[in-house]
Amino acid sequence: MNDVIKHKIKHNTQRFITSMKWIVFSILSGLIIGSIGSAFYGCIKMVTELRMEHLWLLYLLPLGGIVIVGLYRLLKDENDTGTNLVLSAIHSNEEIPLRMAPLIFISTVITHLFGGSAGREGAALQIGGSIGGALGRLFRFNEKDKHIMIMCGMSAAFTALFGTPMA
């Protein structure tokens, strides 16, 4: 076999392996993060309906704020830059802590329960990016592939938030 054919076989084999890797990891991240994103959507919907039925919950908004501040202090995440951290992690080697996902999930649900103003979309991006980054670290991906996993996580959570995890 001549060298050109060997090179083409090697190159195509590497492309095939890379394609299979991303098919597996996109399905894995979609299932995990899409499920969490759907749960987030369900919780937001449930607490919003609950608040609409019990308008007196609005008076407990300061209590909800105290609980959220306590959670941030407990998890030592007082300098959280939110969605900016997730977006900057895509363009740099900055890591998104996994603790961001449950913290944002819980604090956003609490905020919506008591009638606070918090966007679901930014929260979904933070949750998905945090979990995607953690999956990238778990499987020891290089920096470029970690960035791809962060973006996969963000898109999985974002689409699940709108009730469209499967297209």
Model-derived features: positions:
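Alpha-helical transmembrane segments and immediately membrane-proximal extracytoplasmic
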Residues: 1-167
